[in-house]
A protein has these predicted regions:
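Short alpha-helical transmembrane segments in multi-pass integral membrane proteins
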Residues: 1-24, 82-147, 183, 189-245, ...
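Residue-level signal for short hydrophobic patches within transmembrane helices
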Residues: 13, 17-36, 40, 63, ...
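Transmembrane helical elements of multi-pass membrane transporters/channels
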Residues: 22-41, 143, 154, 177, ...
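Residue-level hotspots within the lipid-embedded alpha helices of multi-pass solute transporters
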Residues: 31-35, 69, 109, 113, ...
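Helix-terminus/linker motif at the lipid-water interface of multi-pass membrane proteins
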Residues: 32, 36-55, 124-131, 187-192, ...
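Alpha-helical transmembrane segments of multipass membrane proteins
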Residues: 39-42, 114, 156-160, 182-187, ...
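Small-residue-rich hydrophobic transmembrane alpha-helices
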Residues: 54-114, 151-170, 275-339, 372-386, ...
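Short runs within selected transmembrane alpha-helices of multi-pass transporters and secretion channels
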Residues: 75, 143-162, 170-181, 197-212, ...
């Protein structure tokens, strides 16, 4: 059955550059909103509760990324078959994938919440979290992990909407929740400490998720379900898991390297932790364009592979890489001029060591933003093409890079070595991803040609 595409966005026809920019810009704004209220959390903690509290929240960043990133990867992976069925015009299979994906995501989020809430304090101790910030770190991350089902709700619904070409609606709902998050931060941080900022985050994201769900149910007329769509079918479950689990593992394996690196940073003391936290928040904000381009290419590649248009996939990679490279040069110039002033958002001017170290990390990382562009664009493209296992291997490359720095360089070169950990990880990932993409493209072209000859 052909899909009526007027309610959604078809990325298989038209100028790739215009389509990528048109799709990525709303997605970018949504990510900026998300990072903005994450930054506001950190700014409020640093200014209202002090450098120790800032370090406490920051020390949870890598384990947060590992667990929450795994959940986000699962959700994004579940949306790839939806994009492919949309590109192929198969409405029945599309609805089956959405229904089965929703059931799996619900079961997964509940299980994950129970497990990580039980073990999160032990994990923080294993990571050698400094004793003077351990209680604050636990108070923050426990609440964040309690909110995993709400986070999965938002990411699952927004990923489905993006797979159908709508990157604007999730942005609107995220903007609303961002404002609410800031208000709740200001209300809850003084009486509840760092836990208050965590409650503000999960409440805001939960509201955003429910808004996405209600809107999707009302506006996406192609999503008309039957009871069969909600029953788990072996074929759809296997395909969803083949996409979702590798994509989740990609985030988690990458994050394992970050956890190992964070453990090394923790060994340098709470001042180093605070420096990495401030620089990390700024860097995450600056990296949103790369994430937006990557997520765009996952949907773009998924739809065009479904439509058997490999030339458009290659053109999309080139366009996204050029866009990301131009941005890399611009943001490096901005941070060279004003990185110290921006760091003052997180700590007082008297914290000169933290300010100097944050600037050092920002500048070293941003010199290598062009390799980071390729990591995001090529990895998400490969995922959208259906080769999620290659994304796992790219994550392994990043994990190895960060682990080598943590184990062998940080003990000798201290904080400076920490600053080079991510660039090493990005370069190793690129050395694997570029040949992997060429292999995937060649494989699909051969498959499409073979199928065409048999018809």
């Amino acid at each position: 059955m052909a899909i009526k595409k007027s309610a959604v966005k078809d990325l298989t026809n038209g100028s790739p550059v215009k389509l990528i920019l048109g799709f990525a810009l709303p997605l970018l704004l949504g990510m900026l909103f998300q990072q903005f209220y994450s930054m506001v959390d950190t700014i409020i903690v640093g200014k209202f509760l002090g450098a120790k509290a800032l370090a406490a929240v920051g020390s949870t960043g890598s384990i947060n990324f590992m667990i929450v990133g795994f959940c986000m990867g699962i959700c994004n992976g579940f949306a790839i078959p939806v994009a492919q069925m949309f590109g192929a015009g198969d409405k029945k299979a599309l609805c089956r994938y959405v229904g089965n994906g929703a059931v799996l995501a619900g079961l997964f989020s509940i299980t994950m919440t129970v497990l990580v809430c039980i073990w999160c304090r032990d994990i923080l101790i294993l990571m050698k979290t400094p004793s003077d910030i351990l209680d604050g770190a636990y108070a923050y991350i426990f609440v964040i992990f309690l909110g995993i089902p709400l986070m999965v709700l938002y990411n699952q619904t927004s990923a489905i909407m993006r797979s159908l070409g709508d990157s604007r609606s999730p942005l609107i709902f995220l903007g609303i929740s961002s404002v609410l998050n800031i208000v709740l931060d200001l209300v809850l941080v003084r009486p509840m400490g760092v836990a208050g900022t965590a409650w503000a985050t999960i409440i805001a994201q939960g509201i955003s998720g429910f808004l996405c769900l209600f809107y999707m149910k009302k506006k996406f007329t192609i999503l008309t379900f039957t009871r069969e769509d909600w029953k788990l079918h072996k074929h759809y479950v296997i395909n969803l898991c083949n996409m979702g689990i590798p994509m989740g593992l990609q985030y988690s394996i990458t994050a394992i390297g970050s956890v190992i690196l964070q453990t090394a940073v923790n060994g340098l003391g709470s001042t180093a932790v605070a420096s990495v936290t401030a620089a990390g928040k700024i860097s995450m904000f600056c990296c949103c364009p790369f994430d937006a381009l990557g997520s765009t290419m996952a949907t773009y590649a998924g739809q065009n592979v479904g439509a058997k248009k490999m030339d458009r996939v290659h053109t999309g990679i080139l366009a996204s890489s050029i866009i990301g490279s131009v941005y890399s040069v611009v943001i490096l110039g901005v941070m060279f001029l004003w990185s110290r002033e921006i760091s003052l958002l997180f700590v007082d001017a008297s914290e000169t060591v933290i300010l100097d170290q944050a600037r050092q990390m920002l500048l070293i990382n941003m010199v290598f933003y062009i390799p980071l562009t390729l990591v995001n664009v090529v990895r998400f493209t490969v995922q959208g093409m259906g080769f999620s296992k290659f994304a796992i291997l790219a994550g392994v490359c990043e994990m190895i890079g960060r682990s080598v720095v943590a184990f062998f360089l940080v003990p000798y070169f201290g904080y400076t070595a920490v600053c080079f950990a991510s660039p090493v990880a990005w370069i190793l990932a690129d050395l694997f991803l570029v040949p992997a993409y060429l292999y995937c493209a060649k494989t699909l072209r051969s498959l499409f040609e073979k199928n065409a000859q048999m018809m």
